[in-house]
């Protein structure tokens, strides 16, 4: 599985995020408490339950709005049925490329949103995070498509005679 993560065709930051999530190495409040830190374990976004990976990424009412806005609620429910983060990551790796890029961008962006809120910035609405996430996933897919075309030899060469400026 670990090699599959690094072979994903997405930005390295998203690969690193998925790797950390699968390794349970994200600095979640419950994990910090278990390691002996004196922290409030309640999830500061909703103040309803403790901050663990399942609640943060899949079960919190605020993140559910993002999943719904992106028409990924069935995927969210499936991911929520898995236990450890490693199983969730394995399932994500088995998704088709469009769903996979949407899910990876959503999870990564929600982690960034959580960190923004922790630092005192305002919480954005679910539709705002969903719109940002959709655009980002579309950009990743467009880059993948362009790279695929270029690797097959279908791209144009910038140095060709038809595009060179000549001085006569």
Model-based region annotation:
Residues 1-168:
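Primary recognition of RNase H-like, Mg2+-dependent phosphodiesterase/nuclease domains
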């Amino acid at each position: 599985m670990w090699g599959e993560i690094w072979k994903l065709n997405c930005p390295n930051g998203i690969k690193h995020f998925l790797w950390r999530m699968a390794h349970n190495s994200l600095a979640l409040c419950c994990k910090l408490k278990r390691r002996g830190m004196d922290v409030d374990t309640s999830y500061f976004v909703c103040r309803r339950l403790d901050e663990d990976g399942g609640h943060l990424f899949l079960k919190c009412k605020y993140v559910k709005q993002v999943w719904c806005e992106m028409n990924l609620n069935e995927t969210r429910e499936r991911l929520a049925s898995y236990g450890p983060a490693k199983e969730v990551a394995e399932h994500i790796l088995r998704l088709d490329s469009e769903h996979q890029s949407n899910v990876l961008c959503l999870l990564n962006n929600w982690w960034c949103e959580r960190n923004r809120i922790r630092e005192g910035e305002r919480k954005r609405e679910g539709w705002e995070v969903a719109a940002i996430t959709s655009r980002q996933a579309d950009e990743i897919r467009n880059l993948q498509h362009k790279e695929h075309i270029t690797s097959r030899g279908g791209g144009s060469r910038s140095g060709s005679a038809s595009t060179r400026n000549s001085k006569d």
